């Protein structure tokens, strides 16, 4: 039990610094990393070479993920600066006069789509202003997308969270997708219901249960099949697109309740056709499909890979980490590379169509730096912390202590606590 308590200190440190001391994630993560190193050396017998190896693996995993993050941000800002995101938002807003359904489509469906495209706060940053402009309260405008997109995090943004899960656990993705996708599909329904509840409680949910079931069902099924057929990098994106298509169909037949007709809000003229606004994401889907299902393309893009080989290492307490290679990065076939190709094509397309002002390249890069740097700085120490804990046997100590606590009559309670532990890790 002593090892269990010691191994929990890094997590306790992050919680205390972020909740009580109001530190940012990057600063708190760095402090917790320092605590982890001290514990690993003095209480778990981790040698210096193990710490170096663990941190090097953490950097490699961070590079794998950050390649996606930065490329996704570049693509998003290239589309946003052209007006594509606003065009998509306006198109959704014009689908129906039903206020709760507008909230569901924007705060749930469109937010899920944006999570599939970019993630990292983008759904809230984009959807909240749209909802404010439609007359929703500030609290509702922020809360709806914050709740609505959360089910799509694992397979959203090119499945960066899922890739991190695979990298940290070493479990093949094919063994994780089935139950993950089922649970997320059910969570998606609950997220949609929660968004409706925000606007009018259970009465609003009852009145919109048919659109909710249809839209959430379509998104859940599409995500399930994409994930289980090995294309989990597109799971969140395709689910979002399917949800948008389902929303368009549903609104054709759905008549708003007289009490819930939304007020008309003045809007500026829409200069960009919807199909033009969707071009970046259609291009991206084509590129990913070719890179995944065309063997010649997959082989060509995957030729040049960057990885590092790490030797076996062990703690003084006998905890052994076998020799292994870091998660390889296919320089030209990595999901981040596909996003960069898409960004380049989209930028050229929008430039030729006259949607950019002077200085657009500098503006996109500045916005990317502003959004990407905090994420990058915070990610490296936290991933390093997780791998150091794993290599020093601290994660095993947590699992062993947890198994001891949730044993016997308390074993049934563990599935209830497990999601909270996962949220804590996130």
Predicted features, each with a name:
Residues 6-15, 23-44, 66-72, 212-216, ...:
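Hydrophobic mid-bilayer segments of alpha-helices in multi-pass membrane transport proteins
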Residues 4, 61-65, 92-106, 134-140, ...:
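Membrane-interfacial loop-to-helix junctions in multi-pass transporters
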Residues 98-129, 133, 153, 376-388, ...:
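Hydrophobic alpha-helical transmembrane segments of multi-pass integral membrane proteins
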Residues 100-112, 138-151, 172-192, 408-422:
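Alpha-helical transmembrane segments of multi-pass membrane proteins
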Residues 134, 146-252, 272-275:
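Membrane-core helix-loop-helix motifs of multi-pass transport proteins
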Residues 1-9, 62-65, 117-123, 174-189, ...:
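Structural signature of hydrophobic alpha-helical transmembrane segments
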Residues 262-418, 425:
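Transmembrane helical segments that form the transport core of multi-pass membrane transport proteins
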Residues 50, 54, 78-96, 173, ...:
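Flexible loop linkers connecting adjacent transmembrane helices
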